[in-house]
Amino acid sequence: MIKRVLFGILVGVLPLLASDELSIDSLFKKQIGLRSITNLSLLSTGNANSYTMYPNLSITGNPTIWNDTKQLSLNQTFIYTLHPKFDLLVSGNGSYARQEYTNFFTGEYSHNNKWSFNSLWLGLIYTFNSVADFVPQISFQSAVVQRETFVNEDKNFYLKSQNLQATLRGYSDPVVYGIYGGFGYNAKRKFEFAKVEYGNSYYIGGDLSIILSPKITLDLGAEQRFQTEQKINGYQNSEIRSIPTLSIGSTYSVNSDTAVSLSASLGGSSAAPDAIFGLTLWQKF
């Protein structure tokens, strides 16, 4: 989520770069009103894990072992600025997944197709006054509802996951950057046949946008995430998972209210997905 919010700052700024001198305060000054972030992403796991994409990449508790999963996810986020320092956030997402496996009895390759509403999140973002060359920001999000799968059981869970993140943002011509760290909490899930603990997440990362022209940026990012052990019925069935990712992309500012970005992320360990390709539309109202 941090990358989407950080790059969203550039919507409306890029067309002004040719004539306006930017400062740390003018760049991050927010106008009262509504912003929309629509993200379409294609994930290829290349491993046996299942993943959630929002608010951050994490491994779910489904113990089914797949050869590979190709997942197309649509995420819609609305951010309403009540005050230059205070934002409200609501985000919902759903996905289509092609889950590939080898038939145990015949040895043939096969797959399942699954359409699903995934989750609805509410959040708050508070932006502090600038300190030296940085603008501190803190965000908190809670899952209102999450629809999750354990083997063949689908079940809705309410208020079971929360995410807290602290960010330092800055600008040094021609780069807009963010450094962040956070914690993701997952409460125990009770399915019909099992009680599952997904494990909690700890992560740090950074993103930067290099302004190439008044309309185009080159976007880079890196993140290191650790997810604690998963337990089923109190028995540990995984070690701590390391999920490093690297990303590259570009943002094009259509006008002062609209921008489009393309991005690609690569995993750096066996617990990380092979690749994520994303298309994002930013809109101010």
Predicted regions and their residues:
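Detector for outer-membrane/organellar transmembrane beta-barrel domains
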Residues: 32-46, 153-230
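Outer membrane beta-barrel transmembrane domains
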Residues: 49-51, 55-60, 103, 195-285
